A protein has these predicted regions:
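C-terminal substrate-binding subdomain of Rossmann-fold SDR/epimerase-dehydratase oxidoreductases
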Residues: 181-306
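NAD(P)H-binding glycine-rich loop region in Rossmannoid oxidoreductase-like domains
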Residues: 57-91, 118, 122
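Conserved Rossmann-fold NAD(P)-dependent oxidoreductase catalytic core, especially the SDR/UDP-sugar
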Residues: 71, 90, 94-129, 151
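Rossmann-fold scaffold of SDR-type NAD(P)-dependent oxidoreductases
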Residues: 11, 67-72, 113, 222
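Active-site helix of classical SDR
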Residues: 131-134
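N-terminal Rossmann NAD(P)H-binding glycine-rich loop of SDR-like oxidoreductase domains
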Residues: 8-28
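Conserved beta-loop-beta element that borders a ligand/cofactor-binding pocket
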Residues: 115, 138-162, 187, 242
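Flexible, glycine-rich beta-alpha linker
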Residues: 119-127, 154-171
């Protein structure tokens, strides 16, 4: 990345995307302070050049000199925001305001903030995307009035290792994996024709590291594959039973990265098919080992005269 060691703050650094970013930064020899209350993300990277503040972003007080902030902490998911609009908007806006003000006072030269690909699609249709659009308005104010250099990172249905796998925080890919693992049918809301621009976490992180080394950093950084896939096609790749349920309101029909900053190496359909093949092999091996243990136990009893 660079021969110079920098000091980074990563809010939400225990989450899915955040933990991968922290890991990548440390692998490049950088120092990282993670601010995360660990209510959602639980992953900690155990290396000497990472320190943790287990506090709410809005109340944390970082100590030290920092070169850049990655503000990834947020209340995620459109569906969650429908049941708690006040909490979503308040948390997402307040945390961004606090971090932006800290960056202004500390004169931190680089500020990267996570936004949502849905922010460009009817951003007043749900509390989550509304909160993200408010965050951008706030950062633009800080740029014009106080000279804060910020860059918006747009994520497009990120999947891969460490993806959230519980409740409404679960990604679509992980939710389908869990159904296969528990031998339950895949649940599709509506017709399954909705399209999403699924992007592997490794492609996303490679794009962020590339951004850090670039002299000309765009204001809007779209970290998507540029190849949207329908939910139905994704489900079919799992080669598993499917059930349809009533559609959920407030979600876009198509989310596409029209101007990708990265050249995605991973393809979600190929990824899913490989995962399913590996899962089937592991299940067969598990069953074989289970049967062998039964046979060994039976012969052990015979040898002992029982």
């Amino acid at each position: 990345m660079t021969d110079k060691i920098h000091n980074f703050i990563v809010t939400g650094g225990c989450g899915f995307i955040g933990s991968h970013l922290v890991e990548a930064l440390t692998m490049h020899g950088q120092n990282v302070l993670v601010i995360d209350d660990m209510r959602v993300g639980k992953v900690k990277i155990d290396t000497a050049n990472v320190k943790y503040l287990h506090q709410d972003v809005a109340s944390a007080i970082p100590v030290g000199k920092f070169d850049a902030i990655f503000h990834l902490a947020a209340t995620p998911r459109i569906r969650l925001s429908q049941t708690d609009p006040f909490g979503t908007i308040t948390n997402n806006f307040n945390s961004t305001m606090v971090v932006a003000e800290y960056a202004r006072r500390a004169r931190i030269p680089l500020f990267f903030a996570a936004s949502s690909s849905t922010r460009f699609l009817h951003h007043h249709d749900n509390p989550y995307t509304f909160s993200k659009s408010m965050n951008e308005e706030l950062l633009e104010l800080y740029r014009k009035r106080f000279g804060l250099e910020y860059h918006m990172l747009y994520f497009y249905n990120v999947y891969g290792p460490r993806e959230a796998d519980y409740g409404e925080h679960s990604t679509v890919v992980r939710a389908f994996k869990k159904c296969v693992e528990s031998d339950q049918p895949l649940r599709i809301f509506g017709s399954g024709k909705k399209e999403r621009d699924f992007t592997h976490i490794h492609d996303v992180i490679d794009g962020i590291i590339q951004l850090l080394t670039s002299k000309n950093k765009p204001k809007h950084v779209h970290l998507g594959s540029g190849n949207p896939v329908s939910i139905m096609d994704l489900a079919k790749a799992f080669d598993h039973s499917i059930v349809h349920e009533f559609d959920k309101k407030g979600e876009a029909e198509v989310t596409e990265c029209a101007d990708p900053y990265i050249e995605a190496e991973y393809d979600v359909i190929s990824y899913v098919k490989k995962w399913k093949s590996d899962f089937e092999e592991e299940r067969i091996l598990h069953n074989v080992n289970k049967d062998l243990r039964k046979v060994e136990k039976k012969y052990a009893k015979t040898d002992s005269g029982q």
